[in-house]
Amino acid sequence: MPRIEFEPKLDFKDVLLRPKRSTLRSRAEVDLMREYVFRNSKKTYVGVPVVASNMDTVGTFEMAEVLAKFSLFTTIHKHYQVDEWKAFVQRVDSNPQIMSQIGISSGISTSDFDKLRTVCDMIPELEYICLDVANGYSEVFVDFIRRVREQFPTHTIFAGNVVTGEMVEELILSGADVVKVGIGPGSVCTTRKKAGVGYPQLSAVLECADASHGLNGHVMSDGGCTNPGDVAKAFGGGADFVMIGGLLAGHDQCGGEVVEKDGKKYKLFYGMSSDTAMKKYQGSVAEYRASEGKTIYMPYRGDVSRTIHDLLGGLRSACTYIGATKLKELSKRATFVRVTQQTNDQYSAYEVPRID
């Protein structure tokens, strides 16, 4: 018979970080850099572990060039062709600052695998692979991870998405280094409404991080961050990386053209399982499928650098409030308190800084 779990599961909106005594005199003293050695690839990562999503409107080459200046990572979306990858590498002249902060995304079809192998063989500096499916619980996905690990034994593999500890363990033991955590929390994802499936993001991160770290693996919180405070909460919950999409949407570096409506500028932003994405890349929505994503006009925000400064400033502030001198200490210092109200929104909810 159906089973109900009565233990409360929490999202970012359900908690706040409790402030604690601190020896820090300034936010400038906070060190946001992390260094990880991955379980399966044995490679070392150094950077600020905030990751641009591999959505085609966010995970662009242009985004990667800017984010790399801040030591942030970009998972390049899977719809770039081999020639476009070649042109990008030539343009940046294999800049190690950029190449060390990007990964190639791939689906799990035969053609996806062939393109992945071609690009990785062509660009030896490319050391990160992101294997991305909506449902990371499928046996075919686990088999694909094993196949990619066998083909690329020294590449670092991100894989997901899942939301429970036992599946995190399965993916890590199958060859993944970093497991992406999150089903349905994204700002333009409608999976929870269409399928009724999901898991509150903070609880998913807490439980999956515990499972992963027990195997010397890593987790990436993917989705659900509506402001810099949510990013801090994800790190506080044990995430090693935090992937963001909506917070980076609408900028110059995003895919698509700027459009004008009623005198205001916008950029199109949509989920990768939306009607828009499926029609763009597959010609139509298959009869057996339903759209599981929204398409919205995102207010134009100008250059992404301004938003990155705001995001990193919020992270430093969170660390300062709870007495963490380094981002590494955030999860150790974090205590969450349950709340019924986050903020006083009498005038406006949080908005990412943008250029009107």
UniProtKB/Swiss-Prot annotation:
UniProt-annotated binding residues for K(+): 184, 186, 189, 192
An example Gene Ontology molecular-function term: metal ion binding
Residues binding NADP(+): 26-27, 78, 132-134, 183-184, 272, 288-289, 317-320
Pfam families for this protein: IMPDH
Signal peptide extent: none
Matching Gene3D superfamilies: Aldolase class I
EC number: 1.7.1.7
CDD domains per the UniProt record, alphabetical: IMPDH (cd00381)
GO CC annotation terms, alphabetical: GMP reductase complex
SUPFAM superfamilies, sorted: Inosine monophosphate dehydrogenase (IMPDH)
Binding-site list for GMP: 222-224, 245-246, 271-273, 289-293
InterPro entries the record matches: Aldolase_TIM, GMP_reductase, GMPR, IMP_DH/GMP_Rdtase_CS, IMP_DH_GMPRt
Reaction(s) catalysed by this chain's protein: IMP + NH4(+) + NADP(+) = GMP + NADPH + 2 H(+)
Active-site residue list: 189, 191
Protein's GO biological process: purine nucleobase metabolic process; purine nucleotide metabolic process
Keywords: Metal-binding, NADP, Oxidoreductase, Potassium, Purine metabolism
Entries under NCBIfam families matching the protein: GMP_reduct_1 (TIGR01305), PRK05096.1 (NF003470)
Family: Belongs to the IMPDH/GMPR family.
Entry-linked PANTHER family: GMP REDUCTASE (PTHR43170:SF5)
Function: Catalyzes the irreversible NADPH-dependent deamination of GMP to IMP. It functions in the conversion of nucleobase, nucleoside and nucleotide derivatives of G to A nucleotides, and in maintaining the intracellular balance of A and G nucleotides.
Name of this protein: GMP reductase
